[in-house]
């Protein structure tokens, strides 16, 4: 399970990176194997298992992190802070900050929680966010600049809510046309 989560995060981190000149940002230190080893050796089994769990936003609160060392939060379709479908960006950002604070307050490894949001065609869980066509329609435009601009707009709106990980835009090529999430893919052309 842990390997699958790492693989998913790895693939998501490369979303939309092909043929794009990303500015180099030095905000994160290069991985230090000794540091990673030290952190892992200091973690309990409960903390290690917790890092593989991604709880749905509807079923977890910042106070739950005092007891459960959860590694991540997902807000998929129709989830929002405290069930408020019209929550402001400030409410989203406040909740993200609360989760961060509680995840680093527990003691032990103090690994900040990851929050991933489903923003396949915009940050649609946020009231007033810009909604874009699904990827299958965007792929049909064959307009790389448009796709980059949409990706930038979605990233800006997601960051405005204090969330740093989005499950979009995806770079997928349809292999099996029977797959039910075909609309989230671009094109095979």
Language-model features: where?
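Sec-dependent N-terminal signal peptides
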Residues: 4-13
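N-terminal beta-rich core of secreted/periplasmic extracellular enzymes
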Residues: 18-184, 188
């Amino acid at each position: 399970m842990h390997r699958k989560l790492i693989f998913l995060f790895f693939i998501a981190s490369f979303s939309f990176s092909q043929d794009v000149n990303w500015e180099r940002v030095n905000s994160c230190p290069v991985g230090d194997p000794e540091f990673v080893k030290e952190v892992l050796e200091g973690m309990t089994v409960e903390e290690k298992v917790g890092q593989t769990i991604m709880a749905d936003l509807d079923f977890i609160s910042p106070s739950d992190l005092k007891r459960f060392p959860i590694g991540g939060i997902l807000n998929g379709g129709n989830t929002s802070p405290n069930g408020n479908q019209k929550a402001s960006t400030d409410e989203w950002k406040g909740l993200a900050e609360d989760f961060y604070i509680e995840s680093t307050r527990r003691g032990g490894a103090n690994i900040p929680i990851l929050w991933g949001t489903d923003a396949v065609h915009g940050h649609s869980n946020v009231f007033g966010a810009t909604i874009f066509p699904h990827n299958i329609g965007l792929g049909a435009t064959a307009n790389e600049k448009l796709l980059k601009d949409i990706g930038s707009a979605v990233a800006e709106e997601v960051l405005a809510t204090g969330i740093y990980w989005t499950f979009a835009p995806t770079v997928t090529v349809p292999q099996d046309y029977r797959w039910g999430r075909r609309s989230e893919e671009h094109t095979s052309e």
